[in-house]
Amino acid sequence: MIITTSLRENEELIARAQALALDLGADYQPRRKLSLAKCLERFGPFYLLYKDRLSFINSDASELTFHPDTAALRIKAPYDALVSLLGKSPKTILDTTMGLASDSLVMAAAGNQVTALESQDVIFQVVSRGLATYQTDDKQLEKAMRSIEAIKSDSLSFLKAQADNAFDILYADPMFSETIKKSENLEAIKPLANGSRLTEEWLNEAKRVAREKIIIKAHFRDTVFEELGFERQVRPNQKLHYGVLELIDRKS
């Protein structure tokens, strides 16, 4: 894997890129004012370091970057469907599918302690570093970003290593079985993401590790809710539904 810098490079940015290359096990290549198309031609998919963020350029030239704009809008809204399902905060929450971290951020901003898992290395590197370094004047959002513990792991392996009732709530937002709408970051994450569906083995481990409930999100046409026994939370005029599996009564 290659890492290079934005065109607005200086000695400090080059030094950071070289250090990051060592950290990522990647090779640093000077930008030499090459266009992104020329970089792709020479390097294949590559990391791109800007002054304020790390991005990844896919083979189709789509750019994966961290930006909490969607989460910021949801945090400022008077109501959020996911937050309403969590119950009274603070809760300990395991987000088993971090992705772009929008849901993790919304849950953390609501006062919960969030641990977020990401199995795919490129997504983990871009998003976890964004959570740790992204600067904003929105102090609530910045506090939420810094509070999230991001861990590179597939969810099943992580769950198997946890004690019973280790988290209050488990959350999963697997890749959509249906396309919702075009979004640059969603398009960029698609070729990098883990497209695995949730399985009975995953659910059994999740039931053991979660103390209160498991929440999933999927397209309204997805049959995962019925397949795994989740109570579908219908959201009128919304293409994404949540599913909830309450556990407290089963464990009492």
Q: What kind of region is each of these model predictions?
A:
Residues 1-93, 109, 117-169, 235:
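S-adenosyl-L-methionine
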Residues 33, 99, 218-221:
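Short, polar loop motifs at secondary-structure junctions
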Residues 92, 112-113, 147, 212-213:
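Residues at the starts of beta-strands that form the adenosine-phosphate
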Residues 96:
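Conserved beta-strand/loop positions that form the S-adenosyl-L-methionine
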Residues 100-112:
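Conserved SAM-binding loop of SAM-dependent methyltransferases across substrates and taxa
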Residues 174-202:
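Mobile active-site "lid"/loop adjacent to the S-adenosyl-L-methionine
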Residues 199-246:
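Conserved Class I SAM-dependent methyltransferase catalytic core
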